[in-house]
Design a protein with these regions (language model features):
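N-terminal amphipathic, basic-rich helices that act as targeting or association modules
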Residues: 2-32, 36-42
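Carboxylate/His-rich catalytic cores and anion/metal-binding grooves
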Residues: 27-37, 43, 80, 84, ...
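Conserved thiamine diphosphate
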Residues: 1-5, 61-97, 152, 207-246
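Terminal amphipathic helices with adjacent charged low-complexity linkers/tails
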Residues: 32, 36-67
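Glycine-rich ThDP/TPP pyrophosphate-binding loop and its adjacent helix/strand module
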Residues: 143-145, 150-183, 188-246
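Secondary-structure transition/capping motifs at alpha-helix termini
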Residues: 20-27, 48-54, 94-95, 150, ...
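N-terminal leader/propeptide and maturation segments of large enzyme subunits in energy/redox metabolism
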Residues: 64-140
Length: 246
């Protein structure tokens, strides 16, 4: 809410919609560019928390050239910590000292552990049981509580513009897409370098005239979507909020 974007900028509308869907359990790695300027200017930030849960996105800004790697590192880091916590929970559940309530909460958590939407309430219920075990002196429970913020399934997103995704950061982006890991990428495709004044990018269309590319682009637009689809296991969607007013 209340971003510092330029008048008429549509990027914030997409970011707002994504955060409304996933924001309570969302990590964002943001490439330097327009989306980092309106997304994290000094002394203020448009990313906020849900008024009921008081939870919201965790946001970080990366350099232009390594945002995909940065976001992938965020994903792998939280995944590793979560896996460590789950291993401790499995050990606790196998103990004859575990309560029936804990075992039931853990079983329910494991049923939804890969579902971002459904897993959050199950994780909260499980944490309540772990706190009881910790109060009773269980050392494994105390270790799990140190990582409790990672228990709920997270939705990890990598944000950036076409200058990052199509050009300077493409190598890293391709590596992340090829990994097959559960990472989401949002490319704000303005079809030129918007933040630096208007240079042509590989997302610019043939013949396109930009402020600092007045002669017109001589080659066609790179099809990033088709490149991603060529792997056969990457889901690709192209969206335009203004395409259908209804």
């Amino acid at each position: 809410e209340f971003s510092g974007s330029c008048a008429g900028c549509a990027e914030t509308s997409y970011a707002r919609l994504i955060t409304q869907l996933f924001g309570e359990h969302m990590y964002i790695s943001n490439a330097t560019g327009c989306s980092s300027i309106w997304g994290g200017p000094a002394a203020t930030a448009p990313y906020t928390v849900n008024k009921d849960s008081k939870q919201g996105p965790a946001w970080a800004n990366s350099l232009f050239e390594d945002n995909a790697e940065h976001g992938f590192g965020m994903y792998l880091g939280q995944k590793t910590l979560r896996d460590q916590a789950i291993a401790k929970l499995e050990k606790m559940a196998a103990s004859d000292k575990a309560s029936d309530e804990f075992k039931a909460a853990f079983a329910k958590f494991m049923e939804t552990k890969d579902n971002t939407k459904e897993n959050t309430p199950d994780a909260q219920a499980l944490i309540a049981e772990v706190e009881k075990a910790a109060a009773a002196g269980c050392p494994d429970a105390a270790e799990v509580l140190e990582k409790k913020q990672y228990l709920a399934k997270k939705s990890v997103w990598i944000f950036g513009g076409d200058g990052w995704a199509y050009d300077i950061g493409f190598g890293g982006l391709d590596h992340v897409l090829a990994s097959g890991e559960n990472v989401n990428v949002m490319v704000f495709d303005t079809e030129m370098y918007s933040n630096t004044g208007g240079q042509a990018s590989k997302a610019s269309n043939i013949g396109e005239v930009c402020q600092f590319a007045a002669a017109g682009k001589e080659i066609s637009k790179k099809s990033l979507a088709e490149i991603a689809m060529s792997y056969g296991y990457v889901y690709v969607a192209q969206i335009a909020l203004g395409a259908n007013p209804n």
